[in-house]
Structures are given as structure tokens and as C-alpha cells.
Amino acid sequence: PDANTGVIGYFNIPSRNWMYEDFFFEELMPYVESKYRIKSNKRFRAISGLSMGGGGTITYALHRPDLFSAAAPLSAATGSLDIDKSIQRLNSFGFKYNRDEVRSLLKSNHPLELIDDIPLNKLNSVRWFIDCGDDDYLYEDNSLLHIAFSDRGIILEYRVRDGEHNWTYWRGSLPKVLEFVSQSFHQF
């Protein structure tokens, strides 16, 4: 969603007039559900993405567990909770954010910030499938998610296979993701 806009991410950033999450839930989803013959309730809705889209997948499912029966992030880019590291990483991609913007983004969107404030029954109303390659540069972040989810009592499938942050790895994951999502539609 960055598309050379000078902002990055699937989240609302009011200071940058970037309301991507609102667009996703208030415009894109209703449009898709009105245009195509699909069932538009939680029981038949899942979300999945890879890399930055994997980070968006987790956060959207945490923000709106009432909407998704399953969430399947692959190689999720969640970033560091350390403000200085986050600023450095954003700068490396050419994005300039100040400390207050980064602090606000982390507090309202980072999964490790969110899971303690959501009732466990809501967290477990979503079936979780987290998958990341053991040579992926995001492996540590995904491992920390797995540990935090497990410590919180969130039921999840966590998969680590040989692989990097690339399409070769993700293509190998897609059959399992589709099977997992399909099974999620039959859980009710």
C-alpha cells in the first residue's frame, strides 16, 4: 500500500492523512462483498498476507477479531518495539517518521502491544496460523510472536521450515494455508 506515497503500512496514520485501515474495512471489504458472490460473515472470512501483508494480517485480525475466522500471516513483518530501531528501519526504506509517530504506531498496531488488552476468548475466536522460514530475516520477530501468543494462551499453529524471505518459500506454504483456512470455515 505504500505506492510511492511517502508513507508505509496498512495502518491509519492521521498525522500523514493516511487512513489505510479505514479504507480496508469501510470501503474495500464492502465493495468486494457487494461485487462478488461471497459470504460476508465471520464464519466465512479469513485474512492472510506475506511480509508487510503478514504484519497487516495479524494486526487487522487483532483489531477486528469479530470479522475473521482465521488469520494466516506468512513471514510477518511486525518490526521492533524499540522506537530507535523502528525509526532506523523506516529510514533505511526512505520513510521519515518522528518519535511520536513511531511510538503511536507501535502502541496501536504492534501485535505484542495489542494481545494483552484483548480478552482471550476473542483472541481464540480467530484460528491463527503463523509461518516463517528459518533463514528469513523476520524469523526472530515471528518466533517472538509465537512465544507471546503461546504465553498469553492463544491457540495457534506455528510453522517453521527451511527457507528464506522469498516466493519459493511462500509458494510452499500456500497449500497448507488454504487447507487451514478451509478447515476454519467448518469450525462453527
What are these regions (language model features)?
Residues 1-188:
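Non-catalytic cap/lid and distal C-terminal segments of serine-dependent acyl enzymes
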